[in-house]
Amino acid sequence: MKIRVIVPVTTREFVGATRPQYVAAARPDAEISVVGLDRGPVSLESDYEDALAVPDILTKVRVAEAEEMDALIIDCMADPGLAPARELASIPIVGPAQAAMHLAAILAHRFSVVTVLERDIPLIDHLARLYGLEGYLASARPVNIPVLELGKDQERLVEALVEQSVRAVVEDGAHIIVFGCTGMKGLAQQVEQALEEQGYTVPVIDPSLAALKLAEALVDMGLSHSKRTYPPPPPKEIVGYPQGASDGPSQKLLAPVSGASSHPGKLRRRARIRVIIPVVGEHWIAPVQEAYGRAGRPGTEISAVAIDRGPASIESVRDEALAIPAVLSQVRTAEEEGMDAVVLDCMADPGLDPARELASIPVIGPAQAAMHLAAMLAHRFSVITVLEQGIPGVHRQALRYGLTEKVASVRAINIPVLEMSEDRERVTRAVIEESAKAVCEDGAHIIVPGCTEMIGMAPVVQECLAERGCEVPVIDPPAMSVKLAEGLVDMGLAHSKRTYPPPPDKEIVGYL
């Protein structure tokens, strides 16, 4: 896996400092190369400077794709040039702000961004609106230390980050903190610990880490941004700019690093993930465990369990309600057994909120994970669900996750869940047919299969859609859930206990 990081400034010290920080956090099989700009500003602290950085960013994007990089990160919280870069390239291109804000929205109901200067606050507000997350943004607060001074006095920076984070929690109601500059790399755990010591238990997200883990996940899943949202620009002469990667200025690349051999401090923790099947029936366990196991990276341990009381399948709100008590029991057991994360194997995300109140380890809902990923890769997504009667439930979920405006449509294949395993070919054909209609008739730019029983179908559906001229990405929600779980374990993050506080300690008759 080859990941290129573009540091969108001309300051060589920033470029040199960036490489070891990414390498230390990357997977052992990831090769990280870093490049700065040959023309542009020394730091980015205004729209004006962002605009002047973009032309050379695009040159670097062309070069990265020509050099067969698997993914690319633009290392700045302004996400400069993200949209035009995605028009220009087919490989995944990740913006730290987009990745971190969506991750914050998955883990908490309200996040605050602690940024650099007062003048950056309107930018944060704008990005939250652009990414459809305005309702999640509690505040943006500055440390009032210019970018070029961030690395000169780390103690002063940490004190300012802690001070503004405390104010964000106490005064603004933030449940999770997002650093507002990639120049704050490597300080998240230190700030989180300092907040804990002051009595404020909130997760702290490093946007560079969020971007890296998203890039790794996209490469693993073979996904990229939708070319219907980001179509290639029309061919035309653009005076004064190179049209091909070979025409660009020299790259001045730092040598690619294979972290497996070069950095003994690299994150190598093996994630232990429990998949909870929220229906009754031990016959589900082996195939589910095998299917999820294929999505995990080498070393990830995945075990599956089914519930012992509840419905045989989930196709209604009633079914979901009757499954949740047993799901919660399994969540408790998973944490007691030392699991690192839990995935709920159902696109209804049954019991996600109470499970997060109950547990401190990450609990992942496939629908939440897949919808947020779809919103990052495209402007409009469609969900292909099971039955017609389940369509309102999908719309409720999109509303719950603040993504209603991103939904192009919800379509059903009208094959009951209990019949899906009997004829996978029939199910795949039905998903392809409804997906094609979603693209051609509803304007979908990306497809989300709406049942975890459709696991593993995404590549086939995506290929068949392309053959029909409906080329869009297709997300595999279970695979995305595994990737999110692995990334959270790598980053030492979980949901916010301010959004999901532990339930009161009291007797509940009939339950453990």
Question: What are the residue ranges of the model-derived segments?
Answer:
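Short beta-strand segments enriched in small/hydrophobic residues
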Residues: M1-G16, F111-T115, L267-I285, F381-T385
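C-terminal alpha-helical cap/extension of soluble enzyme domains
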Residues: R4-V7, A25, D29-A30, V35, ...
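Short, glycine-/small-residue-rich phosphate/pyrophosphate-handling segment
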Residues: E13, I106-R141, E216-S250, H283, ...
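N-terminal beta-loop-helix "entrance" segment that forms/cooperates
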Residues: S33-P55, L148-D153, A306-P325, L418-D423
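Glycine-rich, highly charged phosphate/nucleotide-binding loops
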Residues: S46-V63, R156-Q164, S316-T333, R426-E434
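Periplasmic-binding protein-like
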Residues: M69-C76, A174-T182, M339-C346, A444-T452
